[in-house]
Structure formats: C-alpha cells, structure tokens
C-alpha cells in the first residue's frame, strides 16, 4: 500500500448497477408530464419520457424479448435481459387507426438487440391522422429501480441514451 493510496480512493456509487435505455426513435425528448393523455402524464402505466419523433422507424431500445406488439401496431412491450419492462406507445389515439400508417417488422416473443427494427411508420400520415404523435417510452416496473435519470434534447434512434436506471 503506497503513501498516496488513501488520497485517491474513488467515491463508490450508491447504486450497484446502471442500465441504459437507448432511443427507439429519432426526435426530441419531451417531459412525460407534457403528453396529452393522463395515462402517461400522470405516470399511471410507469415513468419515462416522450419523444416528438422524426424519421420512420421504431427500434429496439434495449436487448431483450418483445412481449407483445399490439394488433394496431402502434405500441409494443419489451423485457430486457436485466428485467426492465419497457413500453413504447406511438402517438395518442393511434389505436383508432387500426394499423394504418404502421408496418410490423418484429414478432411477439422475438429476441431483439439494440437497434433492431420493430415497426416502420409513415410519419406524415400519422401527423395528419393522429391526435398527437408524441411517443411515450415508459418503464412499467419502475418500482424495481432505485433511481431514473432522464436525458433531454435531440436524440438519434439506436444511438442516444434517453434514460438510465439504477439498482
């Protein structure tokens, strides 16, 4: 043990593990509280962020398994290898479009890696027909984590960290 070893001890994090969630869509991060649907804005289904999307695809934001892609193709759940239960819901009232403007690429129960395409969408059509295109990305089992750190600003699908969860 050297004379200086006690001088440079790094402060240990109070969390044992950090799990990063990447952007499933490109666009701008919006506060979840600003989504025009109380189910999301009041965090009834979980905590997270929303994205004002650009582009035309929704990618896997984590390595894991697709739980369910809704028949209307506007939303899906994914469970990560670490047990994160994540829900991506494109737009508000998009269920009423019954799949119009969406094309499913991935399948229920499919294993996916970060960046794999899950759903393609026609942004111009959805801007015209949906009540809102704000896309909530929420952690439905948020109570299992000690802390959530949310990013802000412009993001790139499959590249930018949008949230970090800590155990």
UniProtKB/Swiss-Prot annotation:
Cell compartments where the protein resides: Cytoplasm
Extent of the signal sequence: none
Residues at which Zn(2+) binds: 74, 89
Keyword line: Cytoplasm, Kinase, Metal-binding, Phosphoprotein, Phosphotransferase system, Sugar transport, Transferase, Transport, Zinc
Active site: 89 (tele-phosphohistidine intermediate)
Main location: cytoplasm
Top-rank taxon: Bacteria
Gene Ontology biological process terms from the UniProt entry: phosphoenolpyruvate-dependent sugar phosphotransferase system
One GO cellular component term noted in the UniProt record for this chain: cytoplasm
The keyword Kinase appears for this protein: yes
Cofactor dependence: Zn(2+)
Site (Important for phospho-donor activity): 74
Modified residues annotated as Phosphohistidine in this record: 89
Zinc recorded as keyword: yes
Domain notes from UniProt: The EIIA domain is phosphorylated by phospho-HPr on a histidyl residue. Then, it transfers the phosphoryl group to the EIIB domain.
Name under which the protein is recorded: PTS system glucose-specific EIIA component
Originating organism: Buchnera aphidicola subsp. Schizaphis graminum (strain Sg)
């Amino acid at each position: 043990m050297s004379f200086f070893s006690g001088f440079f001890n790094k402060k240990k994090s109070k969390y044992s593990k950090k799990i990063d969630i990447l952007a499933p869509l490109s666009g701008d991060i919006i506060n979840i509280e600003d989504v025009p649907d109380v189910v999301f804005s009041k965090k009834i289904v979980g905590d997270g962020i929303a994205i004002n999307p650009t582009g035309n695809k929704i990618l896997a934001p984590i390595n894991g398994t697709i739980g369910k892609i809704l028949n209307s193709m506007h939303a899906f759940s994914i469970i990560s290898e670490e047990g994160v239960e994540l829900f991506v819901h494109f737009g508000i009232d998009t269920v009423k479009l019954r799949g119009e403007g969406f094309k499913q690429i991935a399948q229920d129960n499919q294993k996916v890696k970060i960046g794999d395409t899950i759903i393609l969408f026609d942004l111009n059509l959805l801007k015209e027909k949906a009540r809102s295109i704000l896309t909530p990305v929420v952690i439905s089992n948020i109570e299992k984590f000690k802390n959530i750190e949310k990013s802000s600003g412009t993001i790139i699908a499959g590249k930018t960290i949008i949230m970090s969860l800590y155990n």
